């Protein structure tokens, strides 16, 4: 009945507010002087961007204060460079970017400082295998800033284009300009994602295969992780990963969050991850990045 629904809605609101207060209390308990924090890394989807695909005003103020304090900020994402640049331009950020979870790294001047991919033949072998399995999925292949997909009209590809504000090219692996494929993206029916992931890991153990949402699988060259990317950037800047802060919300962020001295999982992360990773911040719609940075005295 309407009265029951109103009661349920009120209960949910109270529960949500209580959860947020708990996270704020936990963060305040960690408050200390953090002169040893030298660099900040952040994932994009589900972390830096809120549910409207925007950076919240408070989080943006925190990022600008990082710039003012000359604390490096690094965007680290499974997205392509062209999927990250619109965010950088829109909000006037100055930062290095890590694309494809570490397969391609560019500095603040957008010079390539690291790149590694699989060959076109290797990528084609994976795709041939998935075709034989008749998995319910769409795929895209990425090389530097080229994104190829066999059917641009697939609604799953169209949705991905809208989210990342980048355009795919109709084509196949043979159409890729460079013989260096940094990532294969599989957009799966959520009910199939875990099955496809397990099957691919069993068939191709030499690659990094990781779930970045309940519908997305990312396949990169072996040894390509956000954690390894953090190590590379920290080494170039002569910074210990223990002096870094990182933010993420999904399975492809785990190694990074475990590596750094202060790794924060957003409270909108999957429940299984929240049980695995002990340090949390508020969710992407409640200034999770800004809350954690404030608690650590950075801003």
Regions found by a protein language model. Give the residues of each.
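Short, Lys/Arg-enriched N-terminal segments with co-localized hydrophobic residues
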Residues: 9-33
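Asp-based phosphoryl-transfer active-site loop
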Residues: 36-51
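Active-site phosphate-binding/coordination module
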Residues: 52-156
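Residue-level signal for inorganic ion chemistry
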Residues: 66, 77, 101, 184, ...
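Short active-site oxyanion
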Residues: 70-74, 93-95, 182-183, 242-244, ...
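Conserved acidic, metal-coordinating active-site core of Asp-based
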Residues: 129, 133-247, 251-259, 268
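Asp-based, Mg2+/Mn2+-dependent phosphohydrolase catalytic module
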Residues: 259, 264-299
